[in-house]
Amino acid sequence: MSRVCQVTGKRPVTGNNRSHALNATKRRFLPNLHSHRFWVESEKRFVTLRVSAKGMRVIDKKGIDTVLAELRARSEKY
């Protein structure tokens, strides 16, 4: 399973660890992902999504029905 938020599309990005001597070694910055069950009142069922913390805030703001409609529009499985 890839580390991608289903709502926002956030993915890992690359950067550098920097030591005190400013040596650079490659690293990955991973999104803050959680598998979370959301209750969909219109369908009377739970839906499990792999979302970032930002994705949860988007769902709080727009509502789960709107977000699921956007996922369906781009043929995302959930």
UniProtKB/Swiss-Prot annotation:
* Name of a matching Pfam family: Ribosomal_L28
| Recorded GO CC terms | cytosolic large ribosomal subunit
Per the UniProt record, which residue ranges are transmembrane? none
Please provide the Gene Ontology terms (biological process) for this protein: translation
Keywords of this entry? Ribonucleoprotein, Ribosomal protein
By its UniProt entry, which InterPro entries does this protein fall under?
Answer: Ribosomal_bL28, Ribosomal_bL28/bL31-like_sf, Ribosomal_bL28_bact-type, Ribosomal_bL28_sf
Q: Which domain of life is it from?
A: Bacteria
State any single GO MF term: structural constituent of ribosome
HAMAP family assigned to the protein according to its UniProt record, in alphabetical order: Ribosomal_bL28
Task: State the family it belongs to.
Answer: Belongs to the bacterial ribosomal protein bL28 family.
UniProt protein name:
Large ribosomal subunit protein bL28
Source organism per UniProt: Shigella boydii serotype 4 (strain Sb227)
